[in-house]
């Protein structure tokens, strides 16, 4: 009961305290805990029985004693104050300001647990989001309202890629700008500083809401952080009709926090020690993306997770892939060769891409060019494997042509500067110019009418450097 303090705890075990259950207590209820010195802590009920309740403390339990602690049940779940003044602010994982400015002045409170969008109320995602990154826009397109994760590995450039997407993302053909919500879970101080500095330098910080749960914060805070971020995103999208792009990093740290709390509670572990409800817990977060009837706003999610040991079959990327609508995969071998962004096009996928590209949305040739680039680059991988066995000199002329195509594809299509913002037309023109290296008979996934319409014009639209590289790489077979 709010306003009533109960003295005494039953036990203290790390961040978990056990207290006698009071009438009306409910799962997820926020509590206040005061030690004998008057210092206040906040906690959250994470388990209930007939006699007692299990409370996860937000912060250290040092200084708490069984007899000297007092407990108040606040009769509310975890809530976040929301208003448009959230934009440009930096908060901790629980929604408390850490940027030196005062608390958000708003009487509007929202339950951070939220609810997934009613399927009947959903609007199917169709609007193309231009990120300015060719490997995404051209071959693994991001659609407004989609949830498209980035599967990365420790030490790869996922932070730089996320910052670039936040700087450059726009909806093609409109002046509507994105509002960004960034949630960092278990990230180091230098990573947090990188994102803040990046947004300040490029002038987008005023359109970004940041929630930072750093590596030295309590585990339970990492579990609350994405829920606070999504609550802010839903308010801005569905009540203020803004297009919101939500970036989560790192979802692996979030899942590790879930495992830690689950172990503390004594739950039966599932795969690799993660709780059996990991799938449903992730779905609670990911399914809060989308568009709804009656609102022009949207929530688009890009969760970033680092795959332990670069293992895409690990439970975290495995379950994430079941819930989300594709994935962008960063590959270590591309990074080691100095390519940025090191996006592996072949293992990457956007399941909603087909519904957001084409005539009237991007360009009439988009689907055909993307499909042909996939097929041709897949052939490159086969030829490279063969060349590693028999040697490049023993390959037929057509296979040598594919090798040259693969090298230039990685150098000019996949690779770009982190401040280079390519339009979709530039991306498709680069794709056409690279495909011109191959014999016309090899462009079997493109309608001949599209080849006649776009090939010559696109080749003349690219940079002089790329045109020169293509001319130098041509073989007699490519001209046949």
UniProtKB/Swiss-Prot annotation:
The keyword Phosphoprotein does not apply. It comes from the Bacteria. It holds the Pfam family ATP-synt_ab_N. GO terms for biological process: proton motive force-driven plasma membrane ATP synthesis. The keyword Protease does not apply. Keywords: ATP synthesis, Hydrogen ion transport, Ion transport, Transport. HAMAP family: ATP_synth_B_arch. Produces ATP from ADP in the presence of a proton gradient across the membrane. The V-type beta chain is a regulatory subunit. Belongs to the ATPase alpha/beta chains family. This is V-type ATP synthase beta chain 2. It comes from Treponema pallidum (strain Nichols). The lineage of its organism: Bacteria, Pseudomonadati, Spirochaetota, Spirochaetia, Spirochaetales.
């Amino acid at each position: 009961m709010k306003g009533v303090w109960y003295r005494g705890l039953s036990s203290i075990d790390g961040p978990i305290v056990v207290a006698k259950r009071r009438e009306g207590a409910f799962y997820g209820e926020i509590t206040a805990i005061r030690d004998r010195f008057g210092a206040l802590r906040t906690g959250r009920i994470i388990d209930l029985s007939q006699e007692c309740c299990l409370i996860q403390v937000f912060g250290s339990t040092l200084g708490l004693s069984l007899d000297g602690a007092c407990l108040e049940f606040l009769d509310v779940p975890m809530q976040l104050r929301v208003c448009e003044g959230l934009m440009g602010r930096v908060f901790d994982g629980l929604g408390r300001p850490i940027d030196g400015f005062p608390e958000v002045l708003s009487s509007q409170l929202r339950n951070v647990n939220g609810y997934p969008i009613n399927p009947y109320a959903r609007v199917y995602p169709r609007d193309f989001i231009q990120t300015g990154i060719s490997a995404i826009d051209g071959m693994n397109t991001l659609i407004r309202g989609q949830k498209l994760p980035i599967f990365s590995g420790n030490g790869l450039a996922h932070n730089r890629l996320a910052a670039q997407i936040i700087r450059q993302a726009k909806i093609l053909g409109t002046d509507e700008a994105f509002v960004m919500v960034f949630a960092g879970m278990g990230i180091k101080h230098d990573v947090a500083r990188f994102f803040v500095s990046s947004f300040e330098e490029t002038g987008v910080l005023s359109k970004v809401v940041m929630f930072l749960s750093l590596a030295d914060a309590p585990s339970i805070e990492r579990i609350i952080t994405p829920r606070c971020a999504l609550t802010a995103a839903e308010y801005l999208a569905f009540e203020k009709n803004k297009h919101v792009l939500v970036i989560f990093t790192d979802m692996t740290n979030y899942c590790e926090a879930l495992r830690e709390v689950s172990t503390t509670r004594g739950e039966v572990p599932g795969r690799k020690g993660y709780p059996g409800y990991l799938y449903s817990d992730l779905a609670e977060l990911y399914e809060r993306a989308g568009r709804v009837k009656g609102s022009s706003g949207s929530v688009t999610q890009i969760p970033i997770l680092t795959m332990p040991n670069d293992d895409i079959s690990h439970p975290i990327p495995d379950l994430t892939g079941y819930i989300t609508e594709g994935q962008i995969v960063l590959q270590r071998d591309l990074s080691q060769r100095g390519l940025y962004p090191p996006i592996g096009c072949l293992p990457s996928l956007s399941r909603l891409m087909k519904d957001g590209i084409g005539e009237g949305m991007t360009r009439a040739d988009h689907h055909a060019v993307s499909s042909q680039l996939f097929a041709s680059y897949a052939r490159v991988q086969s030829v490279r494997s063969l060349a590693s066995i028999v040697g490049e000199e023993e390959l037929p002329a057509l296979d040598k042509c594919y090798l040259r195509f693969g090298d230039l594809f990685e150098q000019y299509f996949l690779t770009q500067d982190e401040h280079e913002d390519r339009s979709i037309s530039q991306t498709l023109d680069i794709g056409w110019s690279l495909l011109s290296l191959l014999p016309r008979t090899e462009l079997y996934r493109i309608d001949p009418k599209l080849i006649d319409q776009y090939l010559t014009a696109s080749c003349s639209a690219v940079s002089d450097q790329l045109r020169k590289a293509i001319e130098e790489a041509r073989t007699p077979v490519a001209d046949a």
